[in-house]
């Protein structure tokens, strides 16, 4: 199983599937279509049935039941795309067997070093096989680790028919990283009563609370003139963007928050004197606080418009997803089964809120309650990203055990 995980994962991460916030196509990048087509063929090779990829790039497949019991149909999901925060092109995964727990030089030329000082969890992976980047790209364990685990788990169930299970549905979705994963997901066609996203982090992660999330695009319009004669004429769009950011509470940013604390996060800022564009994400677990944060952004924009003119700042803000807890609580047994599955495998469940989002956040509101399970990755979305193959193996075992327990309890 370990070699299959390594082989699949290292092959999958080499395919550039970064999504693109600016694109209006579905999916937003051709790499996701390419990857989806590959997975369709591999799902068929494994032996799954009803394997499809629709025009929007959503891949679905079925592992038929091997029991006569009336078992609820369950699903397992992962996403095709990788994050836009750092380059995902030309990923060169590096395999470190029997990791010694010490610093790893990812790229000697660029002096990129993965250190325990910066990442204190690193020594806990001593003895594991871990896969890192070469220091020039992200790895893409989010979510190709989860995707790999689902593929390997389905293969394992097919080759071990003594493990009884009900009908299992599998889905791989595009554009999760930009909040559009479930936008065209056909819940009815998927046909599951419940599902699990394999999109978590370290060993034991079990999550069924997520942020309420919104995205805000701000366009700042300036007036450019020669700087030598600019007095009372020039309006610097980049300075307007800086002024806007200055209104936000400094301590309410990702680098200063944890647990149930929300934040404003400036994802990118590009521009010049004439025009600048800033992209923010807004996050909070509490719905009232979430609405208050959005109103704060609107009020800052209004203040600046009154100061500089209506055209100086243009705001586009959209909700992306909501806290899934409200939809999971009525079917709490799906969390309990995952919890019991982990305990039976000597994995200590680590239940905590997702400081991020998964497709499950939106799917839960679309009628498909979907908690999230660990995949084994650390430091997502950057050059220090890595994954433990040993933990990936545990994730596969959890998928298999969840399927077995649903059948057993039917």
Curated annotation (Swiss-Prot):
One of its GO terms (biological process) is proteolysis. It catalyses: Release of the N-terminal residue from a tripeptide. Zn(2+) 2 binds at residues 142, 177, 381. PROSITE patterns: ARGE_DAPE_CPG2_1, ARGE_DAPE_CPG2_2. The keyword Zinc applies. Its main location: cytoplasm. GO terms for molecular function: metallopeptidase activity; tripeptide aminopeptidase activity; zinc ion binding. Zn(2+) 1 binds at residues 79, 142, 199. Its EC number is 3.4.11.4. This is Peptidase T. It comes from Bacillus cereus (strain B4264). The gene is pepT.
């Amino acid at each position: 199983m370990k070699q299959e995980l390594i082989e699949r994962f290292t092959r999958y991460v080499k395919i550039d599937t970064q999504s693109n916030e600016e694109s209006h196509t579905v999916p937003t990048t051709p790499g996701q279509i390419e990857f989806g087509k590959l997975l369709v063929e591999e799902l068929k090779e494994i032996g799954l049935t009803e394997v499809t990829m629709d025009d929007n790039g959503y891949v679905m497949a079925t592992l038929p039941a091997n029991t006569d019991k009336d078992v609820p149909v369950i699903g397992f999901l992962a996403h095709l795309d990788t994050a836009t925060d750092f380059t995902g092109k030309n990923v060169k995964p590096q395999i470190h067997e029997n990791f010694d727990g010490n610093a790893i030089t990812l790229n000697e030329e660029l002096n990129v070093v993965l250190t325990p000082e910066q990442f204190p969890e690193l020594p806990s992976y001593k003895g594991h096989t871990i896969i890192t980047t070469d220091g020039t790209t992200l790895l893409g364990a989010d979510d190709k680790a989860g995707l790999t685990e689902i593929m390997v788990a389905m293969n394992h169930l097919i080759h071990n028919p003594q493990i009884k299970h009900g009908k299992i549905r599998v889905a791989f979705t595009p554009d999760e990283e930009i909040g559009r994963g479930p936008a065209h997901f056909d819940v009815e066609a998927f046909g599951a009563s419940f599902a699990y996203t394999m999109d978590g982090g370290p060993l034991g992660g079990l999550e069924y609370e997520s942020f309420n999330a919104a995205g805000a695009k701000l366009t700042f319009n300036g007036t450019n003139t020669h700087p030598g004669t600019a007095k009372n004429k020039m309006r610097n769009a980049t300075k307007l963007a800086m002024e806007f950011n200055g209104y936000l509470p400094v301590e309410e940013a990702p680098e200063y928050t944890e647990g149930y604390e929300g934040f404003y996060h400036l994802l990118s800022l590009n521009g010049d004197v004439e025009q600048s564009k800033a992209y923010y994400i807004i996050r909070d677990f509490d719905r009232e606080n979430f609405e208050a944060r959005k109103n704060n952004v609107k009020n800052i924009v209004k203040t600046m418009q009154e100061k500089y003119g209506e055209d100086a700042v243009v705001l586009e803000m959209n909700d992306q997803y909501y806290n899934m807890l409200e939809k999971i609580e009525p079917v709490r047994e799906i969390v309990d089964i995952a919890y019991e599955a982990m305990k039976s495998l000597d994995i200590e469940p680590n239940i905590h809120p997702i400081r991020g989002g998964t497709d499950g956040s939106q799917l839960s509101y679309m009628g498909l309650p979907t908690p999230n399970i660990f995949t084994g990755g650390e430091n997502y979305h950057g050059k220090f990203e890595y994954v433990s193959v040993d933990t990936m193996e545990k994730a596969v075992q959890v998928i298999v055990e969840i399927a077995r327990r649903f059948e057993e309890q039917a």
